[in-house]
């Protein structure tokens, strides 16, 4: 695998998610991309029970699956204070969580997934995801992988140009938020700024990006004014600048 980036796509007023994904699919095919099956990434969150009574944050276990790795279950344990522990296990981990009902309870109302078509274009793999939570449409999430590189710092500009050329939106020159420099504690107990964009990319990095985006979608507020939560609803999304090219796509 190579470096993978997630990019939310703005859904214009009056257009359904299905319509926009259809238009993006046609654009990819016109560029010479080939359809290469379907994909699915899902996330279910379990909350510790009982919840602390002293106001302290409770623990959460996020369980994710990625169709690119069908034999694996990805788990991210959050202690509620910002510290996370990531685990990769086989699918028996799902059965384990079902047997821990006295300790963790599933928040089924927030179960969320991104699914859709998968395309291959040269060294790129592009996935057009329709994000739904409890069968309610939440937005469009684009996944793009550059297979020929495993360190973002070496290929970000190429990925960025591909995103802008295909999507027609302005993509920030800065590295995505997931790759922002982080403060870590060294073995000597000293704080040090760590440049994550120089790390070798791993499958868990893709999963963590999905959790980041899914968390954002869970927080989204549906715009008022006759826009329900069905497939054609308009959702509050990230601030993304649209070029004239993509504006024309929206009007089609």
Swiss-Prot record:
It comes from the Eukaryota. Keywords: Activator, Nucleus, Transcription, Transcription regulation. It is found in: Nucleus. GO terms for cellular component: mediator complex; nucleus. Coiled coil: none annotated. Its main location: nucleus. One of its GO terms (biological process) is regulation of transcription by RNA polymerase II. One of its GO terms (molecular function) is transcription coregulator activity. Pfam families: Med20 (PF08612). InterPro entries: Mediator_Med20. Belongs to the Mediator complex subunit 20 family. Component of the Mediator complex, a coactivator involved in the regulated transcription of nearly all RNA polymerase II-dependent genes. Mediator functions as a bridge to convey information from gene-specific regulatory proteins to the basal RNA polymerase II transcription machinery. Mediator is recruited to promoters by direct interactions with regulatory proteins and serves as a scaffold for the assembly of a functional preinitiation complex with RNA polymerase II and the general transcription factors. Required for activated transcription of the MtnA gene. Component of the Mediator complex, which includes at least CDK8, MED4, MED6, MED11, MED14, MED17, MED18, MED20, MED21, MED22, MED27, MED28, MED30 and MED31. PANTHER family: MEDIATOR OF RNA POLYMERASE II TRANSCRIPTION SUBUNIT 20 (PTHR12465:SF0), UBIQUITIN SPECIFIC PROTEASE HOMOLOG 49 (PTHR12465). This is Mediator of RNA polymerase II transcription subunit 20. It comes from Drosophila melanogaster.
């Amino acid at each position: 695998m190579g470096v993978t980036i997630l990019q939310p796509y703005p859904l214009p007023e009056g257009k359904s998610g299905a319509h926009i994904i259809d238009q993006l699919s046609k654009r990819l095919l016109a560029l010479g991309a080939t359809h290469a099956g379907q994909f699915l990434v899902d996330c279910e969150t379990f909350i510790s029970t009982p919840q602390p009574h002293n106001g302290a944050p409770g623990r959460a276990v996020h369980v994710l699956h990625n169709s690119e790795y069908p034999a694996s279950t990805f788990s991210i344990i959050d202690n509620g204070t910002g510290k996370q522990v990531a685990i990769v296990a086989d699918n028996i981990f799902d059965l384990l969580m079902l047997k821990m009902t006295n300790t963790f309870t599933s928040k089924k109302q927030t179960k969320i997934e991104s699914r859709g078509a998968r395309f291959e274009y040269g060294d790129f793999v592009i996935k057009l995801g329709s994000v739904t939570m409890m069968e309610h449409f939440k937005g469009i999430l684009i996944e793009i992988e550059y297979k020929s590189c495993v360190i973002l710092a070496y290929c970000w500009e190429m990925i960025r140009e591909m995103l802008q050329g295909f999507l027609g939106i302005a993509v920030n020159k800065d590295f995505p938020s997931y790759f922002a420099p982080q403060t870590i504690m060294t073995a000597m107990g000293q704080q040090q700024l760590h440049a994550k964009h120089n790390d070798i990319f791993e499958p868990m990095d893709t999963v963590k990006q999905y959790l980041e985006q899914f968390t954002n979608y869970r927080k989204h507020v549906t715009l008022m004014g006759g826009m329900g939560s069905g497939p054609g609803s308009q959702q509050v999304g990230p601030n993304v600048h649209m070029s004239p090219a993509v504006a024309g796509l929206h009007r089609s």
